[in-house]
Design a protein with these regions (language model features):
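An acidic, low-aromatic, low-complexity terminal/linker signal
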Residues: 1-247, 253-262, 269-277, 283-295, ...
Length: 324
């Protein structure tokens, strides 16, 4: 597995590292992503999607408070907002990480939550094709449960892309999906959803179960497109519409092998899926990411994770799709 990468130095620190993020929105639909590489003091190289990172700085003064979850170093004040700071190696339970506090902090925005992640050091930004990103079946890291994907640098070194959803769920708890009113004649509706995070798949499944609708899922964009194309081809052979098998498609934005933007473009450009709404459900909640979703034709964009908002977005769209 290899890929040509474009690199950007991260040694400038501060805002300069992230100042061109807005220009990167043109990556939407190109099946490419940009990864910020960093170290946790082990032999591994880790990465995080650039769109999740707001800034990088030296580790600031951190205020410790009682009863913090394991891995949470404390709180900082950042431009008037108090945010928690996690020591990422502890949150990922890396037993071979050196003791002591990481010297750099990545400020991230994830699922409408701003967090600081302490890391040993920040390297550079690379651009990589999503089809060169793989699920982490072969990862042997001590923190393998917190890795959502892997890719490879031109020198053969592997990059482990961290599963922020899993880290947050284990640190702060997954949250409870509350009461959701079931849909009338819910058994008539079918949802197909795709997300590479097991935490997200579990939560989405809970919401759909409470709505009472039937559902199927995939774990990455390529798997989703393969299965959806197969469903459409089978329906075509039987002289039926694929809408009899799926009434709505729910997609994550960033996924191994094919991202949600390319998946949406494929769906929207295939007449067999005419009339089937596509909802993008992503932890990348900025307006820029909403615009990226709109540019490829999504019918709605929902930021993770609010079970009520997700349910109330899907409900009228399913009813309308069922009538059409």
């Amino acid at each position: 597995m290899s890929s040509a990468v474009m690199t950007t130095s991260a040694t400038g620190g501060g805002h300069s590292l992230m100042e061109s993020v807005d220009a990167r929105t043109k990556l939407a639909g190109s099946n490419r992503m940009e990864i910020l590489l960093f170290s946790l003091g082990t032999n591994e190289t880790f990465g995080i999607n650039v769109f999740k990172v707001r800034e990088v700085s030296k580790t600031p003064t951190i205020t410790r408070t009682p009863n913090m979850p394991a891995g949470v170093e404390g709180l900082i004040s950042l431009r008037g907002n108090v945010i928690p700071v996690l020591e990422l190696s502890q949150a990922m339970q890396l037993t071979d990480a050196p003791p002591g506090r990481g010297g750099s902090m990545m400020v991230t925005e994830y699922s409408k939550r701003t967090l600081g992640f302490l890391v040993h050091g920040v390297d550079r930004i690379i651009r990589v094709e999503w089809d060169k990103v793989r699920a982490p079946e072969a990862v042997t890291s001590g923190g393998h449960a917190y890795i959502t994907a892997i890719t490879e640098l031109p020198n053969g070194k592997l990059v482990s892309i961290v599963d922020v959803e899993q880290i947050l769920a284990n640190t702060f708890g997954e949250g409870i999906v509350g009461q959701i009113e079931p849909m009338h004649a819910a058994e008539d509706f079918n949802v197909f959803f795709v997300d590479d995070s097991s935490v997200a798949r579990k939560k989405i499944g809970e919401v759909l179960d409470k709505l009472g609708v039937k559902h199927k899922h995939a774990a990455n964009g390529l798997e989703a497109w393969t299965r959806l194309s197969g469903m459409a081809g089978h329906a075509q052979q039987l002289g039926r519409s694929v809408k009899e098998e799926v009434n709505l498609i729910l997609v994550d934005a960033e996924m191994p092998e094919m991202d949600g933007y390319v998946l949406t473009k494929n769906i929207k450009s295939d007449p067999r899926f005419d009339g089937i709404p596509v909802v993008m459900h992503s932890s990348l909640s900025s307006e820029a990411n909403r615009a990226m979703g709109k540019s490829v034709g999504v019918d709605a964009y929902v930021a993770k994770f609010d079970a009520d908002i997700l349910a109330e977005t899907l409900r009228p769209m399913l009813i309308k799709a069922g009538r059409d």
